[in-house]
């Protein structure tokens, strides 16, 4: 009888190992899968404005009265700003736009940018670090919009953001290259709560989206 117990014990051990493996697999089963896909283009333009190593543009909103933001959703102080590209390849097609990326200042509930009770100190890196640590301004946020005034929602993908696209033109200084000028708006927007008077600052990163 003893010799016959060896294959039986081996078979039992294999069955137990298979059962334990199945249990472990079930315990670590996913609830779903996120597939992430994208496209990288060899199209290259140089950001001309904002210039400098960090390509930081300062948009100065006008000084306004709290009364201009009387109720939730009111906008005031719409201010245009540009992003200009140069040295684009002559093959660049129409439809270049900016993607305003999510970050620490994004309010996912409102789709606007949180404003902070802090003044800009002309040092982009220091200001960004200070903003994150500063107190959030009450009753007001900053909105990015297209030229026609339609809101560009923050915290969504590029398709949902629906930022206005712009077409390249031949660079008169170099006919072998193209340039692109992108135009958007920034403004104050009223959110729930009482507005506290004082300086406010925020920031948002951007990337260029090519056709």
Residue ranges and their predicted role:
Residues 2-8, 26-211:
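Mature extracellular/passenger domains of Gram-negative fimbrial/pilin and adhesin proteins
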Residues 7-17:
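Sec-dependent signal peptide recognition
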Residues 17-28:
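Hydrophobic h-region of N-terminal signal peptides that target proteins for export
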């Amino acid at each position: 009888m003893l010799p016959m117990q060896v294959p039986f014990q081996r078979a039992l051990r294999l069955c137990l190992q298979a059962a334990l493996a199945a249990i472990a697999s079930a315990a670590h089963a996913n609830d779903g899968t996120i597939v992430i896909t994208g496209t990288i283009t060899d199209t290259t333009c140089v950001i001309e404005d904002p210039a400098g190593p960090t390509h930081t543009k300062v948009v100065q909103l006008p000084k306004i009265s709290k009364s201009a933001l009387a109720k939730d959703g009111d906008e005031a102080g719409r201010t245009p700003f540009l992003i200009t590209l140069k040295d684009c390849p002559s093959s660049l097609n129409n439809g270049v736009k900016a993607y305003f990326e999510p970050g620490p200042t994004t309010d996912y509930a409102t789709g606007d940018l949180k404003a902070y009770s802090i003044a800009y100190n002309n040092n982009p890196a220091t200001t960004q670090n200070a903003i994150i640590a500063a107190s959030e301004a009450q009753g007001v946020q900053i909105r990015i919009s297209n030229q026609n005034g339609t809101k560009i929602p923050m915290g969504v993908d590029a398709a949902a953001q629906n930022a206005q696209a712009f077409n390249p033109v031949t660079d008169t200084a170099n006919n072998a290259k193209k340039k692109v000028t992108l135009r958007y708006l920034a403004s104050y927007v009223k959110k729930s709560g009482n507005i506290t008077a004082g300086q406010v600052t925020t920031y948002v990163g951007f990337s260029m989206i090519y056709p």
